[in-house]
Structures are given as C-alpha cells and as structure tokens.
Amino acid sequence: MKTTLRNVFALTVMAAAFTACSDDDKKASSSFELIPSAFEGDIEDGEVVLDANTTYKLVGPLVVHTGATLTIPAGTVIEGVGGTGAYIAVEQGAKINVNGTEAKPVIMTSGNTTKNGGDWGGLVICGKAPINRGTVTAQAEVSGLTYGGTVTNDNSGVIRFLRIEYAGATYSADKEFNGLSFFGVGNGTVVENVQAFHGSDDGFEFFGGTVNTKNLVSFGNEDDQFDWTEGWSGTNENWYAKLSFGKGNRGIEADNYEFGYANTPISNPTIKNMTLVGPGSAADGTNFAENSALKLRRGTYGSFDNIVVANWKVGFDVENDETIAAVPSKLKGSNVLFASDVPAETKGKKTDGTTADVAGVVTSKSATATGAGAGVAKPTWANNWTTGL
C-alpha cells in the first residue's frame, strides 16, 4: 500500500509539472528585448506584457509582427518622445490587447514637457478585412505595412479604455499620423471606450475594413474628428466629438474612395447615438476652414440615427453625384437635432460644382434626440477615463 501511494504521489507531481509546462508553452515568452527607457523595435514572436508600474518612453517605431501579441495592462503609460519616428503599429496577423478600465485607462501620450499635437506618431492597426482600392491588399500610408484582404471577421485584438494624446506627427510631405488609424481592420477586433485627444491630424480614421466601435471620443484634433474611406462598413454606437484649441476642420469627413467613387465594397457605416460640436458658425475661416459637421462625399453611403449637431456653419454637407444619388435610400440621418447655431442644416454640391437639393438626407428630426447620451454635453459613459471634456 505504501509503495502504491508513493507511486501515485510521484505521478501526481509529474502531471502537475507537465501541466505547468504546457501552460507556459501556451504563453510563450517573446525574444523581444524590452527596455522601458528606449521602447522601440520589432516584436516578432510570443507575447510581450507591459508593467503598469513602469512608464515606457517610445523613442522609435514599435511594430508587432504576425503571430506576436502586445498586451498592455490597465493604468500603463506610454510616452512618445521620438517625434515622427515614435509610433506603435500592429501588422496583419498580430494582436494588441489594451486592457484599460474606467478607473485606470491606458494612456499613450507625449513625453515632452510642453505637449502639443504632433509630438509623436500614433497607433496604427493593419488587418485582413476588405478594402476597395482595386487591389486585394495595399500598403498603409503611414508605417508602410500591408493591409486589406478577404477576412471580414479578422481579429487584431481587444482595445478597451485607451486614451491617445498629442499624436499626429508628420510621416511624409503629405501624410500625417492620426490618433488611431484602422487599415483594413476586421470585425473580430473589439474597440470600446477610446479617446483621441488634441492630435495634429484626424482623431480616428478608417481605411476600409469592417471593424465596429463603441464609445469613441474625439476632442480637439486639428483636422477631422472622424474620417473614413476605402469601403469601411462598421457598426458603431456612441460617438462624441468636439473641436477645441483654436483649430480644426470637420466633425466627420467621409469618402467611399478618392480615386473611384463607385468602387466596391462601398463605404457604408452605421452610427447610432452621435454628438458633433463645432467651433461656431462664425468661427475664424482660416483656422476652421472646413466648418461642416458631416462632409459626405466621393460616393459614401451611411446611416446615422439619434444625432445631435451644434455650432457648425453646415450640418450635412453632401458632395459629388454618386453621393447625392444615395440620398436618402443609402445615405440618411434620422432623429436629428440641430441643437444650436447651424444656419445651413444641409448643403449639396454636384461633381460639376453646381448646387443640389439634399434636404432629404435628413429623413426625420427629433427635439428629444440625445446624441451620444447627453446632447451637446459630455455623456456619462465618458466619465472618469477621458480628459479635456
């Protein structure tokens, strides 16, 4: 009996050791050399997990390559100090997991003493979902990574409670980073509770793909607060945008594709519960040169419901024949409230430059529309984890 018990005990210990080894194998460590004071390089394998008690100085490009994962725990701070060269990019087949919380968001910000939009690049994610450039794949305008494909449910990870501040550094003569750029990102990716704050270009931009989003805040970005092109077709809920800092353009700039207005798949997002607050209809025409809440052009479709628009020269600004033809069957806003100071609720311009009646783009108005949740005010879901509102 004693011998049998000893044998059973030995087998139990061996089994436990084997299980532990198997679990370790599932979470294989990476060969990446993690240096917090010089955070850059190529994550080519395994999983790199950051430490929330450490501040990471992003001095150059950090690229997560196919098969690798970058995991960022709640409360982690990453400071960009490398200007244009400092950005985080996620390659096709790689993943980023941002595990922030309302109390402890992950913060990607400027490491400069005096912080300004454009102090560092931003976050770039490349997926395998469809685009409409006429080729199955393409190279991202920032980072140069490949994006696009045929995988609508492609998964690039999970992003929750993330704040991106002072991004938008110039990448080339005519290209700038956005706060968060989605290149062909699929709807297997989770994006919830993200703020883009005071970047020098767009807050969020979607280049094709099918990614869905919830609870996005774009505040004080110096170009458009939201932008899409190349056939993006995500489903979205709760967007809040507000211009600030004395400079900016549209609430939304929306294209199908600049060089093929009818290219398929056609951009066709659905957005429910959105507030767009502008600089005022009489704002300075130099610093706020494109004073429209929604610029819908180049063949885009879209459906917008429960929308609050305030303080813009133009509300729904529809341009190009293909876009106008989509009104109101495939391009429309319902339950819209022009809360204050929107002298031109709609405006239309054909491709030849002549005017068009696009009043039908607003299919219904609602005096009780709440937009992102609280009319023009900060929605409650943005409490605690956002800044500037």
Language-model segments: residues:
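Extracellular beta-rich repeat passengers
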Residues: 27-54, 58-65, 69-70, 81-93, ...
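Short, charged beta-turn/beta-strand-edge "cap" motif at the junction between a beta-strand
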Residues: 77-79
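Aromatic- and Lys/Arg-enriched surface recognition patch
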Residues: 105
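Bacterial Sec-dependent N-terminal signal peptides
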Residues: 1-6, 11-40
